[in-house]
Amino acid sequence: MALPFQLGFQDATSPIMEELLHFHDHTLMIVFMISSLVLYLISSMLTTRLTHTSTMDAQEVETIWTILPAIILITIALPSLRILYMMDEINNPSMTIKTMGHQWYWSYEYTDYSELCFDSYMIPTSDLKSGGLRLLEVDNRVVIPMEMTVRMLISSEDVLHSWAVPSLGLKTDAIPGRLNQTTLLSTRPGLYYGQCSEICGSNHSFMPIVLEMVTLNCFEKWSTSML
């Protein structure tokens, strides 16, 4: 989860988020190198007194500044396309969970179980227990087995919402009349927090998401107790 004064991303909990972090560092390094070169050229032009007035054209320079940006764009585009395909690829999910956005709460349905469904509301600050996180705790967490591929089907009953969990690298729009899907895979147990990331009305800020990643045995016990 996010911490006060945090400057970087949240710790990655899924292979997709790890790839996104690597891509961010890769792109940031390219931006840093370009910025350093531009600053060096600007400082050189401001500090040197030497001028070159006899050159009417410079084909070599023009060739370089045409080819070099193309190479840079390719080095950014290829890993980006790879991650996009990874995010869209869903192969043999172990479980499917349907998520519906409402004003202003989420409802979940485990489609592999006949009657396992519930609504998830934010716990008001006045009802928080000791150690609870303000505006992030919910009355019903989404319990998911770790190290298993889970397909999330996401839609909305009323207006546009967006189901987002940063530590898993997930952000999928919930659109009325349309069913979007994404996949998640957690590499370790724990609680992972997210929020609605699309302005959806006056209580938009009060639609938290809490995923509880547990072992398969714990999930089976929980699902049995909920049925």
From Swiss-Prot:
Mitochondrial intermembrane compartment segments: 1-14, 88-227
Membrane topology: Multi-pass membrane protein
Mitochondrial matrix membrane side: 46-59
Cofactor section: Cu cation
Catalytic activity field: 4 Fe(II)-[cytochrome c] + O2 + 8 H(+)(in) = 4 Fe(III)-[cytochrome c] + 2 H2O + 4 H(+)(out)
This protein's GO CC annotations: mitochondrial inner membrane; respiratory chain complex IV
Cofactor note: Binds a dinuclear copper A center per subunit.
Primary location: mitochondrion
Subcellular location: Mitochondrion inner membrane
InterPro entries with a match to the protein in the record: CcO_II, CcO_II-like_C, CcO_II_C, Copper_CuA, Cupredoxin, Cyt_c_oxidase_su2, Cyt_c_oxidase_su2_TM_dom, Cyt_c_oxidase_su2_TM_sf
Keyword line: Copper, Electron transport, Magnesium, Membrane, Metal-binding, Mitochondrion, Mitochondrion inner membrane, Respiratory chain, Translocase, Transmembrane, Transmembrane helix, Transport
Residues annotated as binding Mg(2+): 198
Main enzyme class: translocase
Pfam families membership: COX2, COX2_TM
Family statement: Belongs to the cytochrome c oxidase subunit 2 family.
Cross-referenced PANTHER family: CYTOCHROME C OXIDASE SUBUNIT 2 (PTHR22888:SF9), CYTOCHROME C OXIDASE, SUBUNIT II (PTHR22888)
Binding partners and assembly: Component of the cytochrome c oxidase (complex IV, CIV), a multisubunit enzyme composed of 14 subunits. The complex is composed of a catalytic core of 3 subunits MT-CO1, MT-CO2 and MT-CO3, encoded in the mitochondrial DNA, and 11 supernumerary subunits COX4I, COX5A, COX5B, COX6A, COX6B, COX6C, COX7A, COX7B, COX7C, COX8 and NDUFA4, which are encoded in the nuclear genome.
Record's protein name: Cytochrome c oxidase subunit 2
The species this protein was found in: Phyllostomus hastatus (Greater spear-nosed bat)
Taxonomic classification: Eukaryota, Metazoa, Chordata, Craniata, Vertebrata
